[in-house]
Amino acid sequence: MKALIILGLVLLSVTVQSKVFERCELARTLKRLGMDGYRGISLANWMCLAKWESGYNTRATNYNPGDRSTDYGIFQINSRYWCNDGKTPGAVNACHLSCSALLQDNIADAVACAKRVVRDPQGIRAWVAWRNRCQNRDVRQYVQGCGV
């Protein structure tokens, strides 16, 4: 019985751990997934966005009480428009995926959804953190020394 309790605690701790990317590790991953120059957006801008939205944390979430939506994952993609979390009223799910897919350590789904977001007229300006922290700023520091 004691072994089952310990096993349960170990499994629980594994499921709640998140991956927080190192800066250059994320830069290389985003480059490999085709983000550098996607829709004219530099890799440095994507890195700045991820830094200020999630701190490079794949499991970051942020509840928005005003519209009862939640932002998910490394890019803080919103459940009102882009994914289905089963609890956001009037959700659109334009990325056609579960919001839990945006919380995975493998960020391929998050990248695919971010690419979908920037195909809309707002582009990268859809992210408030990008507008406040990255727009019209020198963002080269986010990829400096990463060899990308």
Swiss-Prot record:
**Where can this protein be found?**
Secreted
Q: One GO molecular-function annotation for this sequence?
A: lysozyme activity
Q: Domain C-type lysozyme spans what residues?
A: 19-148
Show the SUPFAM superfamilies listed in the entry.
Lysozyme-like
This protein's record includes keyword Signal: yes
**Cleaved signal peptide residues:** 1-18
Task: Write out the catalysed reaction.
Answer: Hydrolysis of (1->4)-beta-linkages between N-acetylmuramic acid and N-acetyl-D-glucosamine residues in a peptidoglycan and between N-acetyl-D-glucosamine residues in chitodextrins
Q: What positions does UniProt annotate as the active site of this protein? A: E53, D71
Check the record and name the Pfam families matching this protein: Lys
Q: Which cysteines share a disulfide bond?
A: C24-C146, C48-C134, C83-C99, C95-C113
Question: What GO cellular component entries does it have?
Answer: extracellular region
**Enzyme class label:** hydrolase
Keyword Secreted (UniProt)? yes
Query: Which keywords accompany this UniProt record?
Result: Antimicrobial, Bacteriolytic enzyme, Disulfide bond, Glycosidase, Hydrolase, Secreted, Signal
Biological process according to GO: defense response to Gram-negative bacterium; defense response to Gram-positive bacterium; killing of cells of another organism
InterPro entries membership: Glyco_hydro_22 (IPR001916), Glyco_hydro_22_CS (IPR019799), Glyco_hydro_22_lys (IPR000974), Lysozyme-like_dom_sf (IPR023346)
Its EC number(s): 3.2.1.17
Predominant location of this chain? secreted
Q: Which domain of life is it from?
A: Eukaryota
Q: Which family does it belong to?
A: Belongs to the glycosyl hydrolase 22 family.
* PANTHER family, sorted: LYSOZYME C
Q: How does the record describe its quaternary structure?
A: Monomer.
- What the protein does? Lysozymes have primarily a bacteriolytic function; those in tissues and body fluids are associated with the monocyte-macrophage system and enhance the activity of immunoagents.
Any further remarks? Lysozyme C is capable of both hydrolysis and transglycosylation; it also shows a slight esterase activity. It acts rapidly on both peptide-substituted and unsubstituted peptidoglycan, and slowly on chitin oligosaccharides.
Q: What is this protein called?
A: Lysozyme C
Please give the organism.
Pongo pygmaeus
